[in-house]
C-alpha cells in the first residue's frame, strides 16, 4: 500500500497541534454531518464516521458538542462538499476535498495554492480514476493473524491487513468501515490509532528532492486553507 498511516497521522497531528486548525476542520465536518442527518451518531452513519476519526486526533469533547449543538439549533449556515483534482510538480496527482460556504472563494484559493507551487488544477475526473475510496482502520495490541481471525469470524470482508511498525492496519471498502470497527470492538479492541475514509492512490510515485520539496509546500498551502478538509495524493514522501 505504500503508506505508513501512523507516521502520516503523527506528522499531521504535530503540525496541527500548535494552531488547533484541525479542531476547526473537525468542528465544521461534524456540524455538516449532524445537520444533513440526525444529530445522533447511532442513526447517522456519516456523523459516526467523523466522530470515530475525531477520536484518533484527540479532538476535545467541547469542540464535538459545540458542533452538534449548533446543528441541533437549526443554524442556517450551509456548506457545500466540493472535490477538486489537479497535478503537482512532475505530474503528481492530487485530490482536494472541501467544505465551503463560498464556492467562488474556495475555487480561487485552491487554484492559487496549486499554481503558486508548480501545480495546476485539472478537470473533474482527471486524477480520481487513479485512486480508490478506502476505509483504513489501525489498531495496536494484536497481530495481523489475530485481526484476520476476528474479521473472518464476524464475516467481514476486507481488502488487506498489514503490520506497519507497531500497528495493524486494515484496508477495506468504505461501506465496511463500521463493520470492521464493530467486529474489532466486540473482540475487545477499545482504541483505534487510525480511523479514516480516504482516497488511496493505486500507485505511489517518488519525486526528485527539489520537486518533492515544492510538492510538500503545495500540499501545506492546500491544507492551510480554511475550507480544505482533506488532501490526497500519490507521492511517497518517504516517512
Curated annotation (Swiss-Prot):
SUPFAM superfamilies: YebC-like (SSF75625). GO terms for cellular component: cytosol. It is found in: Cytoplasm. One of its GO terms (molecular function) is DNA binding. Pfam families: TACO1_YebC_N, Transcrip_reg. Keywords: Cytoplasm, DNA-binding, Transcription, Transcription regulation. GO terms for biological process: regulation of DNA-templated transcription. NCBIfam families: PRK00110.1 (NF001030), PRK12378.1 (NF009044), YebC/PmpR family DNA-binding transcriptional regulator (TIGR01033). Belongs to the TACO1 family. YeeN subfamily. This is Probable transcriptional regulatory protein BCAH187_A0615. It comes from Bacillus cereus (strain AH187).
Amino acid at each position: 500500500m505504500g503508506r505508513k498511516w501512523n507516521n502520516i497521522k503523527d506528522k499531521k497531528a504535530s503540525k496541527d497541534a500548535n494552531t488547533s486548525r484541525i479542531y476547526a476542520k473537525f468542528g465544521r465536518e461534524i456540524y455538516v454531518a449532524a445537520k444533513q442527518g440526525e444529530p445522533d451518531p447511532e442513526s447517522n452513519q456519516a456523523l459516526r464516521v467523523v466522530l470515530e476519526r475525531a477520536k484518533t486526533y484527540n479532538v476535545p469533547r467541547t469542540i464535538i458538542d459545540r458542533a452538534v449543538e449548533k446543528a441541533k439549533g437549526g443554524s442556517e449556515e450551509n456548506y457545500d462538499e466540493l472535490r477538486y483534482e489537479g497535478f503537482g510538480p512532475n505530474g503528481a496527482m492530487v485530490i482536494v476535498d472541501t467544505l465551503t460556504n463560498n464556492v467562488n472563494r474556495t475555487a480561487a484559493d485552491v487554484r492559487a495554492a496549486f499554481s503558486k507551487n508548480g501545480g495546476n488544477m485539472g478537470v473533474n475526473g482527471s486524477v480520481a480514476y487513479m485512486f480508490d475510496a478506502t476505509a483504513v482502520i489501525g489498531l495496536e495490541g494484536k497481530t495481523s493473524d489475530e485481526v484476520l481471525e476476528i474479521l473472518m469470524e464476524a464475516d467481514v470482508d476486507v481488502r488487506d491487513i498489514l503490520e506497519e511498525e507497531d500497528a495493524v492496519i486494515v484496508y477495506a471498502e468504505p461501506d465496511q468501515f463500521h463493520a470492521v470497527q464493530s467486529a474489532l470492538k466486540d473482540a475487545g479492541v477499545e482504541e483505534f490509532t487510525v480511523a479514516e475514509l480516504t482516497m488511496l492512490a493505486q500507485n505511489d510515485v517518488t519525486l526528485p528532492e527539489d520537486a518533492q520539496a515544492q510538492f510538500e509546500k503545495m500540499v501545506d498551502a492546500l491544507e492551510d486553507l480554511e475550507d480544505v478538509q482533506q488532501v490526497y495524493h500519490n507521492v511517497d514522501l518517504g516517512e
